[in-house]
Amino acid sequence: MKKFDKLGLDNIKEIFHNLSYDELNAHEKANNEGLSTDNDTFCVDTGIFTGRSPKDKYFVKQDPSSKYIAWGKVNQPITKELFDKLLTKAKQELSGKKIYVQDVFCGASLQSRKAVRFVTEIAWQAHFVKNMFIRPSQEELENFKADFIVYNACKCINEDYKQDGLNSEVFVIFNVEENIAVIGGTWYGGEMKKGIFSMMNYWLPLENKLSMHCSANVGEKDDVALFFGLSGTGKTTLSTDPKRRLIGDDEHGWDDEGVFNFEGGCYAKTINLNPEHEPEIYGAIKRNALLENVVLRADKSVDYADASKTENTRVSYPIEHIENHEPSLKAGHPKNIIFLSADAFGILPPVSKLSKEQAMYYFLSGYTAKVAGTERGITEPQATFSACFGEPFMPLHPTVYARLLGEKIEKHEVNVYLVNTGWSGGSYSVGKRMSIKATRACINAILDGSITKCEFENFEVFDLAIPKALEGVESVLLNPINTWLDKNAYIATRDKLAHMFIQNFKRYEDVKEGIEFSKFGPKI
């Protein structure tokens, strides 16, 4: 117990330190924390919070970190005094209890990884952490020294939030100087995963290493590909390829040695999961995996179509559950980078080759367009711009990440492409979704290098290089103007989308890099 004195908890009844999967499973059942499915996968409910609470995320504003953090709606400031008050409250919640302590690594690169200790009173949260992060060897556990500690006091709420000037009784706070995070009021597992991701996005760029919200895989010739894209663009589906080993599906770093996964597991959406379309994910859901917010039938089988608790049903599992993964969780420098956008306006080409400067522009734009599946009366697509394809998790100014990406693209001569997995032949009410077959053909041409042998033409207004012909893709699809029956509607929609890009990019023009990169976007 003595080695845990530094945690600052009083009268701890018992500490369960680095339990095995079987031990965690036994605790989950004994604590009545959830149910087991028909194939012995444990299944939990995360309560009223079935997603992250971005409005309740704060960074302590103090030097020296305050001069690096890009303060605003994403990175909200909180005082050291208020942090201390809420940390004390969280520690009181965890005191006098039996607690679970889980030690893990974030980052598969020995020179870049961070050692993180999680403290919680809920067994399934320790299980989630064990699934999602890199599991140290026995020897590494014996010599484990935490770089960062997360106190997850999910049962603790802040009743004084109004007088404290906060948004709700929930709080997720990061203290960069003291290397501590504290979570209160939300049970959602993703807060722990994305919280440490946010910290990696603070630490690594200051060491001149790039942190990225992307998936990554590696081919038989050790050629690495990165896939960036917001939710719903096909990032997980397209990076899962029987001919290529999965490095990771969500969070990666890029240092002098190459690309490495931050995680040791995957956190996949399960809504409408179909074993025919996504056999790897379906097959990964077995003992040691952890299902969240799904609905069980009477026979304990999972009804993946049931969204009555949330659309955001999830499963976490160790990456070993994916047969075709890269065991080292790392590889060399990328050969190809693919930006995925599901353009519901039907304007972006199925595939375009980007210059280094255009890559900076589209990386900073982080564009996709969503269709309103849940809101009635909305017929217009909704443009979404998320800096670096992961704005909620980026504590530094987005141009910091863009500059690093540009330097690495140049140094390692990486090819960069923009792939539209969205609509063709019109916006989403008129046109149709790009077929997965056509998108796969574009991806395959990028990965096998055949696209580099194509003849390219210029795509007007956006000034993109698009192939005139590509094996496996109907030529008519390659330039969107050819797929629209109403050419006037096409021109009007194209100019409207270009204007959205231009307007969005103005927010980066507070720094000189932003002004420089703005020259490489659309021009009306």
UniProtKB/Swiss-Prot annotation:
Question: Which cofactors is this protein said to need?
Answer: Mn(2+)
Stated name of the protein: Phosphoenolpyruvate carboxykinase (ATP)
Cofactor-binding details, from the entry? Binds 1 Mn(2+) ion per subunit.
Provide the gene name from the record: pckA
- Binding site residues for ATP: 194, 213, 229-237, 278, 314, 439
Q: What class of enzyme is it?
A: lyase
Query: Can you state which reaction this protein catalyses?
Result: oxaloacetate + ATP = phosphoenolpyruvate + ADP + CO2
Any keyword Lyase?
A: yes
Q: Where does Mn(2+) bind?
A: 194, 213, 250
Q: In which pathway does it act?
A: Carbohydrate biosynthesis; gluconeogenesis
Q: What does this protein do?
A: Involved in the gluconeogenesis. Catalyzes the conversion of oxaloacetate (OAA) to phosphoenolpyruvate (PEP) through direct phosphoryl transfer between the nucleoside triphosphate and OAA.
Q: Name one GO biological process term.
A: gluconeogenesis
Q: Which InterPro entries match?
A: PEP_carboxykinase_ATP, PEP_carboxykinase_C, PEP_carboxykinase_N, PEPCK_ATP_CS
